[in-house]
Amino acid sequence: MEHRFLRTEMVLGDRALDRLSRCHVAVFGLGGVGSYAAEILARSEVGELTLVDQDTLSLTNINRQLYALSSTVGEYKAEVAARRCRDINPDIRVHPLCATYDAAHREDFFAGKFDYIADCIDLVTCKLDLIQQAGERGIPIISALGTGNKLDPTLLQVTDISRTSVCPLARVMRRELRDRGIRHLQVVYSPEPAAETRQLEAPSPGRRSVPASVPWVPSTAGILMASAIVRNLIANESE
C-alpha cells in the first residue's frame, strides 16, 4: 500500500520504520544545523520529536536556516519547526520548547524519555552540560561542532571527538570534556581551516565576532547528524 514513507521502507524495511516510529529524539538548537537535522528525522518517520530553541527567526537566518523565510521572520523557531514536522507527518508527536537549555533549568527538558539527543547548541557551557547530562542518564548523543567560516561540505564527517583536529571548537570541547571525565563523544565536524571573512554585523553580547556561513555547510552537517541518529536507532532492525 502506498504511503508517505514507502520509498524509505523499500530501503530499510518495515521493521526499521516501525522502530523509528516508536523513537523519541530531542534536537537542541534549531539553527543552520539543527533545522536540517529535525527535517531529516521527521522525514525518516521518527515518531516523536522534542524541538528546543529560544530564538525567533531573523532576516540574517535566511541564508542557511530551513525555517527562515520572509514570511516567518519574527516567529519562534521551535514553533515553525513543529508546524513543518506535522505537515510532513500528521502522525508525529512534536513538543516545541521555546526556551534556553542551561544547567539551572536542565530538569525542565528531561521530563520525557529520549532515545537520542542531537546537540546543535552554540554556547559551549550549555553544550557541555547537555553532553554530561546525556551521559549520566544513559542517552546517546551526537554533537555538532563548528560549521561557520567553512566552505567545503565534503570535508564534514561523523567521528569521535578524540579524532578531531584543526577545529577550534573541537579543541575547547576536548579539553573541557576531559576535565569532566568524558573521553569519547560522537560528533559531526570538519577539519577545514576557517575561511577569511569580513565582519559586517555587530556580534551579540558575549561574542567577539559573528561566524560567517554559507547555505551548504550547516545543512550538510545537519543531514549527516540525522543520518547517524537514524542508522544507530535501527541497527539490527533493517531487513
Which role fits each region the language model picked out?
Residues 1-25:
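N-terminal charged helix/coil linker that caps or initiates catalytic domains
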